[in-house]
Structures are given as C-alpha cells and as structure tokens.
Amino acid sequence: TLDKVYLHIYPNAFCDKKSIPFEESEMERAYPNGFNEGYIDIKNVLNNNNKMKYEIIGDKNDILEVKLDKLLKEGESIKIDLKYNVKLPNCLGRFGYGENTVNVTNWFPIACVYDDKGWNLKSYEAVGDPFYSDTSNFEVRLLAPSKYKLATTGEIVEQKTDTEKTLYTIDAKLVRDFAFILSDKFTISKTKYKDVLINTYNLNENMSQEAVDVAKSSIDIFSNLFGDYPYNTYSVVASDFFIGGMEYPMLVMIDESLYNNENKFLLEYVIAHETAHQWWYSVVGNYEISEPWLDEALTEYSTVLYFEQKYGKETGDK
C-alpha cells in the first residue's frame, strides 16, 4: 500500500556545479564552453485535472515525491499527468548539446523502482551508469525543426513534415527508457539483420561503413549467443559525447571522435560493448550502481566473446 510515489527528475542534477554528475577531472571535456545549467521545471502534477501535492527532494533535487490523496493498494493504478519544461545544458555528456548533436536522454520524470527493498531513490551519481527503471510502453509525439534528423528509441510509425517542423509519432514497447538524438548533420546508413532494421547515424563519411558492419555483426553474434535481439530497430548514433559510449533501449551513443582510422579498433570495441548492453541492461534489468556485475561485467565478457567469435580466441584473449 502506497501513500506516495516517486519519480527521478535527472535534469536537476545539472543545475549547478556541486551536483553535476561529472568528476572534477572531466569538467573541461564536459563543458568546453564553460559550465551552464540544465534543469527540469515542474509546472503541474495532476490526477483527473486535480492538482496533486508534490515536493522535490533528494541530494541533488532530482527526486519528485508525489503525495496521493488516497492509499494505492496492490493491483491498483493511478494516472498522473505532469507538465514541465526541460532546459538542456551546452554539455557533451548524456544530456545536453554540442556543435553537432542534441542529446536528449534521461530527460523526463521516470518512475523510481519499488522493489523488495522499497523505493530506490538514489541521485544521479558521477560514477557508473546510475539508472534503474522498470520496462514500460511509450507512445510519443515529438515535434522538431525539419532541418534535424532524428535517432530515437522505438519505431517511427508516422511522420508529418511541413516547411519548418516535423511531427513524429513513435511507438516503443517494453523498454526501460526513452531517448532521442537530433542533428542537422547526420548521414544515415541502413542494413538489416533478419527482421531487425539497423541504422547508423554518422557525422562524416569516415568509418560509416565500419559502423554499419560492426552493428550488424554485434546483433548477429549476440543474438546467437543470448537469444534474439528483442526489438525491430537498432540505432548506432555518432554524438557529441566525450565518455566513449552509452546505451539506451534500441539506441546507443558513440563518441564522434572515435570515427577515424587511428581509433578503428576502439570504435569497434565501443559499438560491440554498447550493443551487448541491449541484453545486459535492456532485456535483463538491474540496479546498475549496486549490481554492476549484471550489466557492465556481463557486457564486458560479451565483448570478449564478440571478438573471439569474429576474429578467433587469440584476439579475444587480448
């Protein structure tokens, strides 16, 4: 029985230098133009058009506590409507924008997990991937300037464009999060693995074919090892992102600086690693801070298996 529900509002972790999820040594790379804030501004929390009482709590003001008018019993549900504005920082992390891409991830109020230990209310930490969420179905309508191309969790089921804006209707089933990336510089390459459409979003032609090949090989190898990739699309997205790679359902971000011959091996490693997270994080969920062996350790082992399968055991052992 619940008298309150909690949601993560991760953008508030970016509102000042004391709370941002970066180590001090990362600040210059995260904010090449100097620190500027990001946040989420909650305008209203409603149930059946009635205002609900709420409070913003947590070490970084990144937890939304919503008080229920009546107790919510096991098996019951409640509809909560949220109105809010989000400001993205000029930041080259998961959440923010750079010269090439707009990275919109961990951006909306997402329900905290209630498990056998109770509510999980940990703030956005600087170390590791501090995310923990249940699977949900998303139906999203996204309006964006027409000059941008869109990489997204889910399938675009409808697209209406006029001279200035494009309205996307997106459907994403059984995913733990919803992320999207926009750019007016993307070139898109496509291929298929069985019934899976694989998209690679590139910011230049360097290594674009290699990115396609690695994405397809990864889906192939991991599907044979761990069971079929469970979605219809998969997108590998070159991004203004200094941390290497980051996984989201049906979509991974890859540091655009890796797309060159000098970093060819590292690019393959990062794409394969992030693809493995589609099984170890996306399919098999876990609390990534307290149980990292369930996502990072298994993903790292899976990456070794990828190189063994593709190039032989000697390469995998390296």
Question: Which residue stretches match the model-derived regions?
Answer:
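Short strand-edge motifs at loop-to-beta-strand transitions and within beta-strands
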Residues: 62-66, 78, 166
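Intrinsically disordered, low-complexity Pro/Gly/Ser/Thr-rich segments with frequent PxxP/GP/PP motifs
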Residues: 67-79, 85-86
